[in-house]
Regions:
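Terminal, non-catalytic protein-protein interaction segments that mediate quaternary/complex assembly
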Residues: 1-242
């Protein structure tokens, strides 16, 4: 995220580092700006990054390298994509990040940093008779103001990408929730957003030459006619395990 100048997680990561330094390593404490600059300058495999910030049980691992009981690693998304190509009308194309082994220990020995249980836990693909690919997402916990817009955008993009590499037409993205909430420190921001006149949606276009899900790069995704209102800043609610 830092490499792509996405800084929505900066403050929380720095606060954990700062607390650790105050308690155990004061000589290496630094200001937030210096901390982020160091993260950006370091390799993802450096000791500084890997020993402190590697998230063993986070979304990507569960979806692309989910550990099985026999020691294998299962690429759930990769398998689903292959099955969609081979037998598109089956009803079992589910990808789940919810692993009971980690539900009550997400912040314990498996992770170097605290991580709450997965919020968007399960998604499923289904193909209609007219060869449209639909995507359904179940999200157990939903921060309506800050995170749900990111979830809508990212899973809609995933639908477009998977449809392209499986030779299907993109259909509908259906988003369901278990617990939907607005945090009390977001009330003013939500009121401001509700006072604004909605604008037309932008359009996403993908590089048609991409045939493999792992070959997509940032420049292969084109956003057209994006005309947003000014950004509304809000703090991330610090409620672990929510």
């Amino acid at each position: 995220m830092v490499d792509n100048d996405v800084h929505i997680r900066d403050e929380r990561a720095w606060k954990r580092y700062h607390k650790h330094c105050l308690e155990k390593d004061p000589a290496n404490d630094m200001e937030q700006a210096d901390f982020i600059a160091k993260i950006k300058s370091e390799s993802a495999y450096s000791e500084f990054v890997k020993n402190r910030w590697e998230l063993i049980t986070i979304y990507g691992r569960m979806r692309r390298r989910r550990p099985a009981s026999d020691g294998r690693e299962i690429d759930q998304l990769g398998r689903v994509i292959q099955w969609l190509k081979d037998k598109p009308f089956r009803k079992s194309y589910v990808v789940s990040a919810w692993n009971p082994d980690f539900i009550y220990a997400m912040a314990s020995e498996g992770n170097k940093s605290e991580v709450p249980p997965f919020c968007h836990t399960t998604f499923q693909f289904a193909v209609t008779e007219d060869n449209k690919l639909n995507l359904w997402l179940y999200q157990r916990s939903a921060d309506s103001f800050l995170w749900v817009p990111f979830n809508i955008a990212s899973y809609s993009l995933l639908l477009l990408m998977v449809a392209q590499v499986t030779w299907l037409k993109p259909g509908e993205f259906v988003h369901t929730f278990g617990d939907v909430h607005i945090y009390s420190n977001h009330f003013d921001q939500v009121k401001l957003q509700l006072s604004r006149e909605p604008k037309d949606f932008p359009t996403i276009k993908l590089n048609p030459e991409i045939k493999n899900i792992d070959d997509f790069k940032f420049e292969d995704i084109i956003l057209e006619n994006y005309d947003p209102h000014p950004a509304i800043k809000a703090p991330i609610a610090n409620i672990w395990g929510s």
